Regions:
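Conserved nucleotide-binding/hydrolysis micro-motifs of P-loop NTPases
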Residues: 1-2, 72-75, 95-102, 152-154
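A glycine- and Lys/Arg-enriched "phosphate-lid" helix/loop adjacent to the NTP-binding pocket
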Residues: 85-133
Length: 177
């Protein structure tokens, strides 16, 4: 979306999710740091959700499989899916609940991907932590599967188990085997 929409039209779209607040109107400068971070994220997610919903609706219409992932895929997106569909929707959120572990993961990511500098994330760590805390609370309220991503192998196993259980439950409900 960033390549299609000029920064002058939607400046919050051209920021990272954890600092989209910097593009919010000036009257929000007086909000607390944590509220600004969350408000900026939600403004940005509102914009991204338009495209995500279009992709989702097209996949439903064309009956194709779709994996939609990212920090902007909020629990509310599920409400945009008609109940008159055969779609199997599995919502999962990953979280790292240990601050030191998340910092280590940022450092490791920067070693494996030259374009993802750890310092950028570490400098904004408090905002990232606040945002993750808020997203995990939203997920808990929406009764989504929350998978702790402290260990890659364990997280992958839990994701696969969650998918498998959801497929099994769907098949039992629809009488398929």
């Amino acid at each position: 979306m960033r390549t299609m929409v000029a920064v002058q039209l939607m400046p919050e779209l051209h920021e990272s999710s954890f600092n989209a607040w910097k593009a919010l109107p000036k009257h929000q400068e007086h909000a607390s740091g944590s509220k600004r971070v969350i408000d900026g994220y939600h403004r940005q997610a509102d914009l991204v959700e338009v495209a995500a919903e279009a992709v989702l609706q097209r996949a439903l219409r064309e009956n194709v499989s779709l994996l939609l992932e990212g920090v902007h895929v909020r629990p509310s997106l599920i409400n945009k899916i008609s109940h008159n569909t055969n779609a199997i929707v599995i919502q999962i959120i990953l979280g790292v609940t240990n601050k030191k572990q998340l910092q280590r993961q940022f450092q490791g990511r920067s070693k494996s991907s030259q374009n993802r500098r750890a310092d950028r994330y570490l400098e904004s760590f408090d905002a990232i932590w606040e945002l993750q805390t808020s997203l995990l609370a939203e997920a808990k309220t929406a009764n989504l599967s929350i998978i702790i991503n402290d260990n890659l192998i364990d997280a992958l196993a839990m994701i696969m188990r969650s998918i498998s259980n959801s497929l099994r439950d769907h098949n039992l409900k629809t009488g398929q085997s």
